[in-house]
Amino acid sequence: MAITTRQYFQLIQDTAASVTRSHANWTSFLRTVARLYPYRFPDQLAIHAQRPDATACTSYDKWNEQHHRYVKRGSKGIALLDDSQATPRLRYVFDVSDTASPQQLPAPQPWTVQESQHADLGQALEASYFIPVGYGLVPQLEALAVQAALDYWSNFRYDILGIVDGSMLEEYDEAEVGALFTQALSASVA
């Protein structure tokens, strides 16, 4: 049974509250969105709520026309909000596990970085972000995540401090909130 727009908004609200309730929930959400990076945050919440195991999602038409795959009969679509019109409505996407290929083509795979690409990627990151390659790609990416979190805190500190009231962080001073925020954000990004 398809959900209504009202049910969709409730689902997003409930999911946002759930993923921020515990470290395990947040980690589970991050595992889902790591595979679904092209989608906006509300869409990522919706996909996680309806199919946390989803790996590659797109519309029925794109599966047919661009990927030469068909959506299997009986597959349940994942509802996402289409707010491109004056009245928001729901649109549906399907995970690759809901598809098959009439020509027996392999399913599209998410991109990965091969070991042989680490050196080139590390050099490109060093040239762009001035973070030395050092001990390898993983520490470099972790350092980049910390740098990005510190930059974000610097740019949006007052906005973030403005929403701390009523949360468990209201007891902390600005420096402590900043440290907790940058630590959590850099861990989430890395």
Where are these regions (language model features)?
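N-terminal accessory/interface modules of nucleic-acid-binding and processing proteins
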Residues: 1-190
